[in-house]
Amino acid sequence: MCDTIVATPAYTKNGKMLFAKNSDRSPNEPQFLQHIPAKDYDLQKTPTLTLTYVAVPQVEHTFEITISRPSWMWGAEFGFNEFGLNIGNEAVFTKEKYVKTDGVTGMDMLRLALERCRSAKEALDFLTEFIEKYPQGGNCGYGKKFYYHNSFLIADSSDAYVLETAGKYWVWKKVKDFFAISNCLCLESYDACSAGLVENAIKNGWCKSKTDFNFVKCYTEPLFTKFAKGRERRVKAMELLGEGSPDVKKFISILRSHAGKAERGYQEVGSICMHAGGVIGDQTTASYVAEIDGADSVYFVTGASLPCISLFKPYVLGKNEHVAEDGEDKKGVGYWLTHEKMLRYFISGTLLTNEIIEKGRAAENEWIDRFLSATKEDRVAISEDAFEQDERLVLKQLDDARTKQISFTRGGAYYRIFWKNKTKKLYEFIKKENKEK
Protein backbone atom coordinates (compact mmCIF):
# COMPACT_ATOMS: atom_id res chain seq x y z
CA MET A 1 0.00 0.00 0.00
CA CYS A 2 1.38 3.40 -0.96
CA ASP A 3 0.53 6.98 -1.88
CA THR A 4 2.24 9.11 -4.53
CA ILE A 5 1.50 12.77 -5.29
CA VAL A 6 2.60 15.41 -7.80
CA ALA A 7 2.02 19.12 -8.44
CA THR A 8 3.07 20.74 -11.70
CA PRO A 9 5.02 24.01 -12.09
CA ALA A 10 1.82 25.84 -13.05
CA TYR A 11 0.36 25.00 -9.64
CA THR A 12 3.24 25.09 -7.13
CA LYS A 13 4.33 28.06 -5.06
CA ASN A 14 7.73 28.52 -6.73
CA GLY A 15 6.96 27.19 -10.21
CA LYS A 16 8.88 23.92 -9.85
CA MET A 17 7.53 20.40 -10.14
CA LEU A 18 6.91 18.73 -6.77
CA PHE A 19 6.72 14.96 -6.33
CA ALA A 20 6.45 12.71 -3.26
CA LYS A 21 5.71 9.20 -2.10
CA ASN A 22 4.98 7.22 1.05
CA SER A 23 5.98 3.58 0.55
CA ASP A 24 3.77 1.34 2.70
CA ARG A 25 5.01 -2.20 3.14
CA SER A 26 5.56 -4.87 5.80
CA PRO A 27 6.82 -3.14 8.99
CA ASN A 28 9.80 -5.50 9.34
CA GLU A 29 10.96 -5.19 5.73
CA PRO A 30 14.12 -3.06 5.51
CA GLN A 31 13.95 -0.44 2.78
CA PHE A 32 17.02 1.66 2.18
CA LEU A 33 18.34 4.44 -0.03
CA GLN A 34 20.94 3.36 -2.56
CA HIS A 35 22.98 5.46 -4.96
CA ILE A 36 24.02 3.71 -8.17
CA PRO A 37 26.39 5.50 -10.57
CA ALA A 38 26.03 5.54 -14.34
CA LYS A 39 27.51 2.42 -15.94
CA ASP A 40 28.61 1.15 -19.34
CA TYR A 41 28.21 -2.50 -20.36
CA ASP A 42 29.88 -4.74 -22.90
CA LEU A 43 26.84 -6.57 -24.27
CA GLN A 44 29.04 -9.37 -25.58
CA LYS A 45 30.01 -10.17 -21.98
CA THR A 46 26.78 -9.19 -20.19
CA PRO A 47 23.90 -9.48 -22.67
CA THR A 48 21.22 -9.88 -20.00
CA LEU A 49 20.22 -8.28 -16.70
CA THR A 50 18.71 -10.33 -13.88
CA LEU A 51 15.79 -8.62 -12.14
CA THR A 52 14.03 -9.93 -9.03
CA TYR A 53 12.64 -13.01 -10.81
CA VAL A 54 13.49 -12.87 -14.51
CA ALA A 55 16.21 -11.74 -16.91
CA VAL A 56 15.83 -9.10 -19.62
CA PRO A 57 18.25 -7.76 -22.26
CA GLN A 58 20.85 -5.34 -20.89
CA VAL A 59 21.60 -1.97 -22.51
CA GLU A 60 24.98 -0.41 -23.24
CA HIS A 61 24.58 2.49 -20.80
CA THR A 62 22.53 3.05 -17.64
CA PHE A 63 22.04 6.43 -15.98
CA GLU A 64 22.97 7.50 -12.44
CA ILE A 65 20.11 6.90 -10.01
CA THR A 66 19.20 6.93 -6.34
CA ILE A 67 16.44 4.52 -5.33
CA SER A 68 14.57 3.41 -2.23
CA ARG A 69 14.82 -0.37 -2.39
CA PRO A 70 13.24 -3.14 -0.31
CA SER A 71 16.28 -5.17 0.70
CA TRP A 72 15.38 -8.41 -1.10
CA MET A 73 14.33 -6.90 -4.45
CA TRP A 74 16.25 -5.71 -7.47
CA GLY A 75 13.71 -2.96 -8.09
CA ALA A 76 12.63 0.06 -6.07
CA GLU A 77 9.58 1.70 -4.54
CA PHE A 78 10.61 5.14 -5.76
CA GLY A 79 13.64 6.88 -7.16
CA PHE A 80 15.14 9.50 -9.42
CA ASN A 81 17.95 9.84 -11.95
CA GLU A 82 20.55 12.32 -13.15
CA PHE A 83 18.04 14.11 -15.39
CA GLY A 84 15.53 14.71 -12.62
CA LEU A 85 13.19 11.93 -13.74
CA ASN A 86 11.14 10.72 -10.73
CA ILE A 87 8.88 7.67 -10.56
CA GLY A 88 6.71 6.09 -7.87
CA ASN A 89 4.50 3.02 -8.26
CA GLU A 90 1.37 1.69 -6.57
CA ALA A 91 -0.18 -1.74 -6.18
CA VAL A 92 -3.55 -1.91 -7.94
CA PHE A 93 -5.96 -4.83 -7.89
CA THR A 94 -7.58 -5.76 -11.19
CA LYS A 95 -9.69 -8.47 -12.80
CA GLU A 96 -6.83 -9.51 -15.08
CA LYS A 97 -5.00 -12.64 -13.94
CA TYR A 98 -1.81 -12.22 -11.91
CA VAL A 99 1.39 -13.88 -13.09
CA LYS A 100 2.64 -15.60 -9.94
CA THR A 101 5.99 -16.85 -11.22
CA ASP A 102 8.47 -15.48 -13.74
CA GLY A 103 6.94 -12.01 -13.74
CA VAL A 104 8.44 -8.53 -13.66
CA THR A 105 7.51 -6.57 -10.55
CA GLY A 106 6.35 -2.97 -10.70
CA MET A 107 9.42 -2.07 -8.68
CA ASP A 108 11.68 -3.70 -11.28
CA MET A 109 9.98 -1.74 -14.07
CA LEU A 110 10.39 1.48 -12.12
CA ARG A 111 14.14 1.00 -11.71
CA LEU A 112 14.57 -0.03 -15.35
CA ALA A 113 12.84 3.16 -16.49
CA LEU A 114 15.06 5.32 -14.26
CA GLU A 115 18.21 3.62 -15.54
CA ARG A 116 17.24 3.88 -19.20
CA CYS A 117 15.10 7.01 -19.71
CA ARG A 118 15.86 10.74 -19.71
CA SER A 119 12.35 12.23 -19.51
CA ALA A 120 8.89 11.50 -18.16
CA LYS A 121 7.46 10.92 -21.64
CA GLU A 122 10.32 8.60 -22.53
CA ALA A 123 9.71 6.63 -19.31
CA LEU A 124 5.97 6.48 -20.04
CA ASP A 125 6.62 5.08 -23.52
CA PHE A 126 9.19 2.62 -22.14
CA LEU A 127 6.78 1.28 -19.50
CA THR A 128 3.80 0.89 -21.83
CA GLU A 129 5.91 -1.00 -24.36
CA PHE A 130 7.54 -3.09 -21.65
CA ILE A 131 4.34 -4.42 -20.05
CA GLU A 132 3.03 -5.47 -23.45
CA LYS A 133 6.17 -7.55 -23.95
CA TYR A 134 6.91 -8.86 -20.44
CA PRO A 135 4.22 -10.08 -18.02
CA GLN A 136 4.13 -8.07 -14.81
CA GLY A 137 3.88 -10.16 -11.67
CA GLY A 138 5.75 -12.32 -9.21
CA ASN A 139 5.32 -12.32 -5.46
CA CYS A 140 5.79 -8.79 -4.11
CA GLY A 141 5.18 -9.57 -0.44
CA TYR A 142 7.71 -9.79 2.38
CA GLY A 143 7.07 -12.91 4.42
CA LYS A 144 3.75 -13.43 2.63
CA LYS A 145 2.29 -13.99 -0.82
CA PHE A 146 1.09 -10.74 -2.38
CA TYR A 147 0.29 -10.25 -6.05
CA TYR A 148 -0.90 -7.17 -7.88
CA HIS A 149 -0.63 -5.01 -10.97
CA ASN A 150 0.76 -1.49 -10.97
CA SER A 151 0.07 2.15 -11.51
CA PHE A 152 2.85 4.73 -11.88
CA LEU A 153 3.26 8.45 -11.36
CA ILE A 154 6.06 9.76 -13.58
CA ALA A 155 7.48 13.29 -13.59
CA ASP A 156 10.38 15.42 -14.75
CA SER A 157 10.85 19.18 -14.43
CA SER A 158 8.13 20.04 -16.95
CA ASP A 159 5.75 17.09 -17.43
CA ALA A 160 3.93 14.54 -15.28
CA TYR A 161 1.94 11.47 -16.29
CA VAL A 162 -0.30 8.89 -14.62
CA LEU A 163 -0.04 5.35 -15.98
CA GLU A 164 -2.46 2.64 -14.82
CA THR A 165 -2.18 -1.00 -15.84
CA ALA A 166 -4.12 -4.25 -15.69
CA GLY A 167 -1.95 -7.10 -16.87
CA LYS A 168 -0.77 -6.16 -20.38
CA TYR A 169 -3.40 -3.43 -20.72
CA TRP A 170 -2.83 0.22 -19.84
CA VAL A 171 -4.18 3.77 -19.90
CA TRP A 172 -2.37 7.05 -19.29
CA LYS A 173 -3.17 10.70 -18.72
CA LYS A 174 -1.05 13.85 -18.55
CA VAL A 175 -1.32 15.80 -15.29
CA LYS A 176 -2.43 19.43 -15.66
CA ASP A 177 -2.14 20.80 -12.10
CA PHE A 178 -1.93 18.16 -9.38
CA PHE A 179 -2.69 14.48 -8.96
CA ALA A 180 -2.55 11.65 -6.43
CA ILE A 181 -2.48 7.91 -6.97
CA SER A 182 -3.05 5.19 -4.42
CA ASN A 183 -4.04 1.53 -4.35
CA CYS A 184 -6.92 1.88 -6.77
CA LEU A 185 -7.56 2.52 -10.43
CA CYS A 186 -8.76 6.10 -10.90
CA LEU A 187 -8.47 7.10 -14.59
CA GLU A 188 -12.07 7.19 -15.81
CA SER A 189 -10.88 9.46 -18.63
CA TYR A 190 -7.47 9.19 -20.28
CA ASP A 191 -5.33 10.48 -23.12
CA ALA A 192 -4.31 7.10 -24.57
CA CYS A 193 -4.87 3.39 -24.02
CA SER A 194 -3.47 0.06 -25.17
CA ALA A 195 -4.85 -1.80 -28.15
CA GLY A 196 -7.64 -4.21 -27.25
CA LEU A 197 -8.41 -2.63 -23.87
CA VAL A 198 -12.12 -2.04 -24.56
CA GLU A 199 -12.59 -5.21 -26.61
CA ASN A 200 -11.14 -7.29 -23.77
CA ALA A 201 -13.63 -5.80 -21.31
CA ILE A 202 -16.54 -6.51 -23.66
CA LYS A 203 -15.33 -10.09 -24.25
CA ASN A 204 -15.18 -10.73 -20.50
CA GLY A 205 -18.65 -9.28 -19.93
CA TRP A 206 -17.43 -6.30 -17.90
CA CYS A 207 -19.31 -3.93 -20.20
CA LYS A 208 -21.68 -4.27 -23.15
CA SER A 209 -20.22 -1.85 -25.67
CA LYS A 210 -17.61 0.87 -26.29
CA THR A 211 -20.06 3.54 -25.15
CA ASP A 212 -20.65 1.59 -21.94
CA PHE A 213 -16.91 1.21 -21.22
CA ASN A 214 -15.36 2.72 -18.08
CA PHE A 215 -11.78 1.64 -17.33
CA VAL A 216 -12.09 1.91 -13.55
CA LYS A 217 -15.43 0.11 -13.33
CA CYS A 218 -14.52 -2.57 -15.85
CA TYR A 219 -11.03 -3.49 -14.63
CA THR A 220 -11.15 -2.93 -10.84
CA GLU A 221 -11.17 -6.03 -8.64
CA PRO A 222 -13.59 -4.79 -5.96
CA LEU A 223 -12.76 -6.81 -2.84
CA PHE A 224 -9.01 -6.13 -2.47
CA THR A 225 -9.52 -2.57 -3.65
CA LYS A 226 -12.12 -1.95 -0.94
CA PHE A 227 -10.01 -3.30 1.91
CA ALA A 228 -6.86 -1.51 0.70
CA LYS A 229 -8.72 1.82 1.22
CA GLY A 230 -6.72 3.47 -1.54
CA ARG A 231 -9.75 5.47 -2.59
CA GLU A 232 -10.03 7.03 0.87
CA ARG A 233 -6.34 7.94 0.93
CA ARG A 234 -6.47 9.35 -2.58
CA VAL A 235 -9.48 11.53 -1.74
CA LYS A 236 -7.61 12.93 1.26
CA ALA A 237 -4.44 13.56 -0.74
CA MET A 238 -6.39 15.33 -3.50
CA GLU A 239 -8.19 17.43 -0.89
CA LEU A 240 -4.89 18.53 0.68
CA LEU A 241 -3.30 19.20 -2.72
CA GLY A 242 -6.37 21.22 -3.68
CA GLU A 243 -5.65 23.76 -0.95
CA GLY A 244 -3.33 25.41 -3.48
CA SER A 245 0.23 26.71 -4.01
CA PRO A 246 2.07 23.79 -2.37
CA ASP A 247 5.76 23.87 -1.49
CA VAL A 248 8.20 21.28 -0.10
CA LYS A 249 6.96 21.67 3.48
CA LYS A 250 3.33 21.30 2.36
CA PHE A 251 4.21 18.06 0.60
CA ILE A 252 5.95 16.80 3.73
CA SER A 253 2.86 17.63 5.79
CA ILE A 254 0.68 15.65 3.36
CA LEU A 255 2.90 12.58 3.79
CA ARG A 256 2.54 12.99 7.56
CA SER A 257 -1.25 13.26 7.58
CA HIS A 258 -3.28 10.81 9.66
CA ALA A 259 -6.83 9.57 9.29
CA GLY A 260 -7.17 8.30 12.87
CA LYS A 261 -6.99 9.99 16.24
CA ALA A 262 -3.57 11.45 17.00
CA GLU A 263 -3.36 9.86 20.43
CA ARG A 264 -3.91 6.38 19.02
CA GLY A 265 -0.86 4.41 18.01
CA TYR A 266 -2.60 2.62 15.19
CA GLN A 267 -3.35 4.65 12.05
CA GLU A 268 -5.52 2.48 9.85
CA VAL A 269 -4.86 1.49 6.26
CA GLY A 270 -6.93 4.52 5.22
CA SER A 271 -4.26 6.86 6.60
CA ILE A 272 -1.66 8.43 4.27
CA CYS A 273 0.93 8.07 7.06
CA MET A 274 0.12 4.43 7.74
CA HIS A 275 0.85 2.71 11.05
CA ALA A 276 0.64 -1.08 11.15
CA GLY A 277 -1.33 -2.89 13.81
CA GLY A 278 -4.61 -3.66 12.12
CA VAL A 279 -5.82 -6.64 10.12
CA ILE A 280 -3.96 -5.26 7.08
CA GLY A 281 -0.55 -4.84 8.65
CA ASP A 282 1.25 -2.46 6.31
CA GLN A 283 3.19 0.58 7.47
CA THR A 284 4.91 3.55 5.85
CA THR A 285 8.51 2.28 5.72
CA ALA A 286 10.11 5.01 3.56
CA SER A 287 9.18 8.48 2.30
CA TYR A 288 10.54 11.26 0.13
CA VAL A 289 9.73 14.62 -1.46
CA ALA A 290 11.34 15.96 -4.66
CA GLU A 291 11.59 19.48 -6.01
CA ILE A 292 12.41 18.72 -9.63
CA ASP A 293 14.66 21.04 -11.60
CA GLY A 294 16.54 18.79 -14.03
CA ALA A 295 20.13 18.19 -12.95
CA ASP A 296 19.61 20.72 -10.12
CA SER A 297 16.76 18.75 -8.52
CA VAL A 298 16.74 18.43 -4.73
CA TYR A 299 15.27 15.75 -2.51
CA PHE A 300 14.15 15.25 1.08
CA VAL A 301 14.30 11.66 2.33
CA THR A 302 13.53 9.83 5.56
CA GLY A 303 15.38 6.57 4.88
CA ALA A 304 13.20 5.26 7.70
CA SER A 305 9.64 4.36 8.69
CA LEU A 306 6.86 6.65 9.91
CA PRO A 307 7.30 10.14 8.43
CA CYS A 308 5.25 11.55 11.31
CA ILE A 309 8.24 10.80 13.57
CA SER A 310 11.20 10.38 11.21
CA LEU A 311 12.87 13.46 9.75
CA PHE A 312 13.22 14.47 6.11
CA LYS A 313 16.89 15.03 5.32
CA PRO A 314 17.96 17.10 2.29
CA TYR A 315 19.79 15.14 -0.38
CA VAL A 316 21.31 15.77 -3.80
CA LEU A 317 21.95 12.98 -6.27
CA GLY A 318 25.42 11.55 -5.70
CA LYS A 319 27.56 10.05 -2.98
CA ASN A 320 26.56 10.65 0.63
CA GLU A 321 28.26 9.11 3.65
CA HIS A 322 24.89 7.95 5.01
CA VAL A 323 23.44 6.55 1.76
CA ALA A 324 24.44 3.09 0.57
CA GLU A 325 26.39 2.81 -2.66
CA ASP A 326 25.91 -0.01 -5.15
CA GLY A 327 26.99 -3.23 -3.42
CA GLU A 328 26.61 -1.75 0.08
CA ASP A 329 23.31 -3.43 0.89
CA LYS A 330 24.28 -4.26 4.46
CA LYS A 331 25.14 -0.62 5.13
CA GLY A 332 21.74 0.43 3.83
CA VAL A 333 19.89 -2.20 5.84
CA GLY A 334 21.87 -1.22 8.95
CA TYR A 335 20.87 2.43 8.58
CA TRP A 336 17.18 1.49 8.34
CA LEU A 337 17.40 -0.94 11.27
CA THR A 338 19.02 1.64 13.57
CA HIS A 339 16.11 4.00 12.99
CA GLU A 340 13.60 1.17 13.28
CA LYS A 341 14.91 0.15 16.71
CA MET A 342 14.29 3.69 17.95
CA LEU A 343 10.84 3.83 16.37
CA ARG A 344 9.71 0.66 18.14
CA TYR A 345 10.15 2.46 21.48
CA PHE A 346 7.78 5.16 20.24
CA ILE A 347 5.27 2.75 18.71
CA SER A 348 5.11 0.79 21.96
CA GLY A 349 4.51 3.83 24.14
CA THR A 350 7.77 3.19 26.03
CA LEU A 351 9.05 6.64 25.01
CA LEU A 352 6.91 9.76 24.75
CA THR A 353 7.05 11.29 21.29
CA ASN A 354 5.94 14.93 21.56
CA GLU A 355 9.17 16.41 22.93
CA ILE A 356 11.32 14.38 20.54
CA ILE A 357 9.16 15.29 17.56
CA GLU A 358 9.26 19.01 18.41
CA LYS A 359 13.04 18.96 18.75
CA GLY A 360 13.47 17.01 15.54
CA ARG A 361 11.05 19.18 13.57
CA ALA A 362 12.91 22.33 14.63
CA ALA A 363 16.16 20.88 13.26
CA GLU A 364 14.38 19.69 10.12
CA ASN A 365 12.85 23.11 9.41
CA GLU A 366 16.22 24.78 9.87
CA TRP A 367 18.10 22.51 7.47
CA ILE A 368 15.32 22.55 4.85
CA ASP A 369 15.37 26.36 4.81
CA ARG A 370 19.17 26.45 4.60
CA PHE A 371 19.25 23.84 1.88
CA LEU A 372 16.63 25.44 -0.38
CA SER A 373 18.29 28.85 -0.20
CA ALA A 374 21.86 27.53 -0.59
CA THR A 375 24.02 27.43 -3.68
CA LYS A 376 24.44 24.13 -5.48
CA GLU A 377 28.00 23.89 -4.13
CA ASP A 378 26.88 24.29 -0.49
CA ARG A 379 24.01 21.83 -0.63
CA VAL A 380 26.17 18.71 -0.34
CA ALA A 381 27.66 19.92 2.97
CA ILE A 382 24.22 20.89 4.33
CA SER A 383 22.90 17.46 3.38
CA GLU A 384 25.75 15.65 5.16
CA ASP A 385 25.23 17.85 8.23
CA ALA A 386 21.50 17.07 8.29
CA PHE A 387 22.12 13.32 8.10
CA GLU A 388 24.66 13.62 10.93
CA GLN A 389 22.25 15.62 13.11
CA ASP A 390 19.54 13.04 12.49
CA GLU A 391 21.93 10.21 13.39
CA ARG A 392 22.88 11.94 16.65
CA LEU A 393 19.21 12.39 17.59
CA VAL A 394 18.44 8.74 16.87
CA LEU A 395 21.47 7.39 18.76
CA LYS A 396 20.68 9.65 21.73
CA GLN A 397 17.16 8.23 21.91
CA LEU A 398 18.52 4.69 21.77
CA ASP A 399 21.03 5.55 24.49
CA ASP A 400 18.31 7.08 26.68
CA ALA A 401 16.19 3.96 26.19
CA ARG A 402 18.94 1.38 26.75
CA THR A 403 17.76 0.60 30.30
CA LYS A 404 14.11 0.33 29.25
CA GLN A 405 12.46 -2.78 27.95
CA ILE A 406 10.07 -2.26 25.06
CA SER A 407 6.63 -2.78 26.55
CA PHE A 408 3.61 -2.38 24.29
CA THR A 409 1.00 -0.49 26.28
CA ARG A 410 -0.79 1.48 23.56
CA GLY A 411 -3.85 0.35 21.64
CA GLY A 412 -6.03 -2.73 21.98
CA ALA A 413 -5.05 -6.34 22.55
CA TYR A 414 -4.65 -7.17 18.84
CA TYR A 415 -2.41 -4.13 18.31
CA ARG A 416 -0.18 -4.99 21.27
CA ILE A 417 0.18 -8.66 20.29
CA PHE A 418 0.86 -7.69 16.66
CA TRP A 419 3.71 -5.36 17.59
CA LYS A 420 5.15 -7.65 20.24
CA ASN A 421 5.48 -10.43 17.67
CA LYS A 422 6.81 -8.14 14.95
CA THR A 423 9.43 -6.64 17.27
CA LYS A 424 10.57 -10.06 18.45
CA LYS A 425 11.13 -11.08 14.83
CA LEU A 426 12.87 -7.77 14.08
CA TYR A 427 15.42 -8.31 16.85
CA GLU A 428 15.98 -11.89 15.68
CA PHE A 429 16.74 -10.47 12.23
CA ILE A 430 19.09 -7.84 13.71
CA LYS A 431 20.93 -10.54 15.66
CA LYS A 432 21.35 -12.57 12.48
CA GLU A 433 22.60 -9.50 10.56
CA ASN A 434 25.17 -8.73 13.27
CA LYS A 435 26.50 -12.31 13.16
CA GLU A 436 26.99 -12.10 9.40
CA LYS A 437 29.04 -8.88 9.52
How would you name each of these model-derived features?
Residues 1-10, 263-272, 408:
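Short, Gly/Pro- and small/polar-rich lid/capping loops
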Residues 2-106, 126-249:
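A contiguous strand-loop segment
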Residues 4-11, 279, 380-437:
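Acidic, low-complexity N-terminal propeptides/linkers enriched in Ser/Thr/Asp/Gly that mediate export
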Residues 110-117:
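Short, well-ordered beta-strand elements within core beta-sheets of diverse protein domains
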Residues 123-132, 248-262, 384:
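Short, well-structured alpha-helical segments that form the helix of a local strand-helix-strand
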Residues 250-282:
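Short N-terminal edge-element motif at the start of the domain
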Residues 269-403:
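Substrate-recognition/cap regions that form aromatic- and gly/pro-loop-enriched pockets
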